[in-house]
Each structure stands twice: as C-alpha cells, then as structure tokens.
Amino acid sequence: MLEPLTIGLPARRIIGLIGHNGSGKSTLIKLLARQNPLSAGKISFDGKDLHEWGSRPFARKVAYLPQQAPDTAGMLVSELVALGRYPWHGALGRFGPEDKTRVEEAMRLTDVERYRARFIDTLSGGERQRVWLAMLVAQNPDCLLLDEPTSALDIAHQIDILTLIRRLVDERGLGAIVVLHDVNMAARFCDEILALHCGKLIARGGPEDIVAPDQLQAIYETRMGVMRHPDSGLPLAYPRS
C-alpha cells in the first residue's frame, strides 16, 4: 500500500526512487505507468486522471520499461526499436517516413545502429538495455518510467546505461523516473531522489540531502557512513559495522 504523494516531473531532470526491497518503488512506478490498477485514490498526469487517457495517447506521452523485459526470442534489433512507433500508427497503420526517421534517430542516439541486423538474444545484457531504450526513444515520449534498468548489469554496464539515460534526458528534454537500488548511482545521476519506506515517502531532495547518515539509516534500517568522492566531490554512502 502506498500513501498519497505528489511527483512533479520537469523536463531535463531525472528523479530516482530508492528504498529497501518491498518499500513500494516498483509498485509506484507500475501505478504511474498504468500497469497496475488503483485500489484507492487517484493519479493525474498532465492535468488528467490516468483512467481518462486512452492507451495510445498515453503511450505517446509516457514510455515504460519494466524490470523484467518481455521475451524477444527471434526478434531483430531493428524490429524491436520499430515497435516504439506503435502508439503513433497502431497495429494496422502504415509505417511511414516519419516512423522510419524516428527509428533511425533512436538507434543513432542510443548507439545501437551496428546491432540492427542482430538477434536480440545474441546481445549482452548492457547491449539489450540500450536496444530497449532505443525503442522508448522511438516512441518519442515526454517522460520515461524505468523500473530498475540496471539491476542485472555489472558496474561498468550500469554506468554506461545511466550515462545514456542522463544524456537522453539532457539532449531531448525528457523527464525520467528511475527505480534504483544503489544509492550512490542515484546520487551520481539523479537530480532529485525520493526515498520510500513501507509505502511511505520518508525523504525527498537532492543527493546532498539524501546521502546523509541519519537519512540513510531511516531509509535502509542500517548504519551508514558518508564520505566524499575524491574526484567529483559527491557524497558516497558505505555500510558501517
């Protein structure tokens, strides 16, 4: 169960959702993406209740990537990216010049052009995430909702994917809400961090506000220390014995 909260999503900003397992992060983002029905209360987007949006008009505004991506066996990279245009022409609509332009631009922006003729299941985890992000970009939304996009990746690929998200947000003027487990990654890449605990928003602010010992203990229920990164000066959290 989630308690009421308000999230503004300005352009060119990334909001990170953090908290322990079961805190409500994925529940919240699924509600925002209309993947789960509301049991009470309401959610508004762009001045309208979510239930008032048609599926395709909503998908033209908001692109969602679940934690467990759908099966893509036997699908080429170019085919998956092209699916991002579905909200604009539907199942029976003609795939026109603008659709082709958007797909090519999306593959270029996410640097997956070289994989266009590859089967998705032959790619590494990081490469697959880039392709999924390319599909979202081809959708041409205003907002991205990303549920743990780095959870199955090693550190190098986590940084690679979050750097790409940061660049897409900055260059295309998108807003993004990203569920993350690593508070240090959130501090490095997010403009604002929302911390959930047992379905309740318990902290909200920039990295300096959230990555503080008392806040971290309240969020994760364990003692945490904080130091400064020697290069960036950003706060870094670490567990204390």
Label every PLM stretch briefly:
Residues 18-20:
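The feature captures the beta-strand-to-loop junction immediately N-terminal to the Walker
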Residues 33:
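Helix-to-loop junction immediately C-terminal to a conserved catalytic motif
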Residues 41-49, 58:
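Conserved ABC transporter NBD signature motif
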Residues 82, 97-115, 140:
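Conserved ABC ATPase "signature" region
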Residues 94, 119-123, 127:
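Conserved ABC ATPase signature
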Residues 144-148:
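Catalytic Walker B motif of ABC-type/P-loop ATPase nucleotide-binding domains
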